[in-house]
């Protein structure tokens, strides 16, 4: 069976990693400012979409400006600011994409393909980020990046045959992705692909989605090939906000772990993913520590009872 993943040379991968390593990280103030500018851009784009639906045709720039109560100069300025801010936030967080993609390096997808998928997730995270909620962007973006990568892995093997005209469009998309990646020194965003291909952004995203192919959830992934894909996929009920709250819990727990017994520390670390980033089930923790599932449950309860008594900081988590 052929694969849709491109074959990338080690030199290309190395050049990409060197290129993104030169990008300066954003300060907290820049993150806040850029986040607000992107929010404004997304509001303007939403208004344009609503206007298009209402009018039944593509609105003129004048109609768009009037709908958002701006003159043409201010509309252009805010669009340009938002696009620049979005680009800056993406470029400054590409190292985060790489660090997450490394966790999923295996035979099913090329490393740069994983990075490409993660970059698309990062782009969505930038678009959805609300700086007023006080989240650190990298924590919020982690959820979007990991979701994009794991879903791409889950859809890697095709179960249906696509029409030839769709396949041709997907091949053109893939070629453009590779060319842009080489020109930019990084993965191309959906917006950049849409501009080069002269296609609507949503259509490009639809083609990207079509280009992903499903595999069995029983497939083994990870460095040691001992983890099933279904263990890596996000809970459908989870959300970026849930993930940020879980990260806050992890941080608070680390500050109190010293008060627990070594065995309690091990249970809490594995259950909440304090060391490896992924939470394990009671059964998996039991296997790691060579103790029963019920013993794990008891140790976790004892540890959480102690932590609850010791700090009001955990009250909202322990109550949930």
Curated annotation (Swiss-Prot):
Sigma-70 factor domain-3: annotated segments: 168-243
Gene Ontology CC terms: cytoplasm
CDD domains, per database record: Sigma70_r4 (cd06171)
Record bears the keyword Transcription: yes
Function summary: Sigma factors are initiation factors that promote the attachment of RNA polymerase to specific initiation sites and are then released. This sigma factor is a component of the biological clock pathway that affects the circadian expression of a subset of genes in this bacterium.
Similarity annotation: Belongs to the sigma-70 factor family.
Protein known as: RNA polymerase sigma factor SigA2
Source organism: Synechococcus elongatus (strain ATCC 33912 / PCC 7942 / FACHB-805) (Anacystis nidulans R2)
Gene this protein is translated from: sigA2
């Amino acid at each position: 069976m052929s694969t849709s993943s491109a074959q990338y040379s080690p030199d290309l991968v190395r050049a990409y990693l060197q290129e993104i390593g030169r990008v300066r990280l954003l300060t907290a103030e820049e993150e806040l400012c850029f986040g607000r500018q992107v929010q404004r851009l997304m509001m303007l784009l939403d208004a344009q979409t609503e206007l298009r639906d209402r009018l039944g045709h593509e609105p003129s720039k004048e109609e768009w400006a009037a709908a958002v109560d701006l003159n043409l100069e201010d509309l252009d300025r805010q669009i340009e600011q938002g696009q620049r801010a979005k680009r800056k936030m993406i470029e400054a967080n590409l190292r985060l994409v790489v660090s997450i993609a490394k966790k999923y390096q295996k035979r099913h997808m090329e490393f740069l393909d994983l990075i490409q998928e993660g970059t698309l997730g990062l782009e969505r995270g930038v678009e959805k980020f609300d700086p007023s909620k006080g989240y650190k962007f990298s924590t919020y973006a982690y959820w979007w990046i990991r979701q994009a990568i794991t879903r791409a892995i889950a859809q890697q093997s095709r179960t249906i045959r696509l029409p030839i005209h769709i396949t041709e469009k997907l091949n053109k998309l893939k070629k453009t992705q590779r060319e842009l990646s080489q020109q930019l020194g990084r993965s191309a965003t959906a917006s950049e692909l849409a501009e080069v291909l002269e296609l609507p952004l949503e259509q490009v995203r639809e083609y990207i989605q079509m280009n992903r192919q499903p595999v069995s959830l029983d497939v083994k992934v990870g460095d040691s090939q001992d983890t099933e894909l279904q263990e890596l996929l996000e809970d459908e009920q989870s959300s970026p906000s849930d993930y940020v709250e879980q990260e806050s819990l992890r941080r608070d727990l680390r500050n109190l772990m010293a008060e627990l017994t070594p065995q309690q520390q091990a249970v809490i670390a594995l259950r909440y993913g304090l060391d490896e980033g992924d939470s394990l089930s009671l059964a998996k923790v039991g296997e790691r520590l060579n103790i029963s599932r019920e013993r794990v449950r008891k140790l976790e309860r004892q540890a959480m009872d102690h932590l609850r008594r010791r700090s009001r900081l955990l009250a909202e988590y322990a109550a949930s």
